């Protein structure tokens, strides 16, 4: 089933100039980038996005970190995109992430773990709508999809 997922490269990925390397992993897997924007996330958007963590002790430092520098917000589409992206991203704690995953290869700390990816269809829809207007998402066909999907 073709799905859309929200993915965000966090400030540490942007500051460390890892955006191109990370983007290429999604494209090499056969996923399609349908929206992307480099943005400075303000405190209100950060608190809304991470609202589920509001009562946790790390919430303040998470908001401070995510608003400290630009992030790269994306919508990525493909066959079973949500689970495929989660596998590419790796475990939340980089020390538990397998080598070969984005976090396993590039991150060292749970608080600075490079990337966020939607964990379910519901969260993908909510996060996409939070960061993108409908007219910012491109619907286009990749000519080699016939070689990737049956």
Curated annotation (Swiss-Prot):
One annotated Gene Ontology cellular component of this protein: cytoplasm
Instruction: Tell me what reaction this enzyme catalyses.
Output: a 2'-deoxyribonucleoside 5'-diphosphate + ATP = a 2'-deoxyribonucleoside 5'-triphosphate + ADP; a ribonucleoside 5'-diphosphate + ATP = a ribonucleoside 5'-triphosphate + ADP
Broadest EC class? transferase
Q: Which PROSITE patterns match?
A: NDPK, NDPK_LIKE
Which Enzyme Commission number(s) are listed? 2.7.4.6
**Keyword annotations of the record:** ATP-binding, Cytoplasm, Kinase, Magnesium, Metal-binding, Nucleotide metabolism, Nucleotide-binding, Phosphoprotein, Transferase
Provide the primary localization: cytoplasm
Which purpose does this protein serve, as stated in its record?
Answer: Major role in the synthesis of nucleoside triphosphates other than ATP. The ATP gamma phosphate is transferred to the NDP beta phosphate via a ping-pong mechanism, using a phosphorylated active-site intermediate.
UniProt-recorded name of the protein: Nucleoside diphosphate kinase
Gene transcribed to yield this protein: ndk
């Amino acid at each position: 089933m073709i799905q859309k997922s929200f993915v965000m490269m966090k400030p540490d990925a942007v500051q460390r100039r890892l955006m191109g390397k990370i983007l290429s992993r999604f494209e090499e897997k056969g996923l399609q980038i349908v929206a992307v924007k480099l943005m400075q996330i303000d405190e209100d958007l950060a608190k809304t996005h991470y609202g589920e963590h509001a009562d946790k002790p790390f919430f303040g430092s998470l908001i401070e970190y995510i608003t400290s520098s630009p992030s790269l917000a994306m919508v990525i589409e493909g066959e079973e995109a949500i689970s495929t992206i989660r596998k590419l991203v790796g475990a939340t704690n980089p020390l538990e992430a397998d080598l070969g995953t984005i976090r396993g290869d590039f991150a060292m700390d749970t608080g600075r773990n490079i990337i966020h990816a939607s964990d379910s269809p519901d969260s993908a829809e909510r996060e996409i709508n939070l960061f993108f207007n409908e007219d910012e998402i491109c619907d286009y066909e990749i000519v080699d999809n016939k070689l990737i999907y049956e």
